[in-house]
Swiss-Prot record:
The keyword Secreted applies. Homodimer. It is found in: Secreted, Extracellular space. The keyword Secreted applies. This is Fibrinogen. It comes from the Eukaryota.
Amino acid sequence: LQPKLEYQYKYHGIVALGIPSYKTQFYDAH
C-alpha cells in the first residue's frame, strides 16, 4: 500500500486502502 493512503485511512489498525467508504468490513478478512 502507498504510505499516504496507509496513514490517512487506518481503522482499528487495519488499512482500508485509502477508501473510507469501505472502511474495514471488506478488508477485515485480509
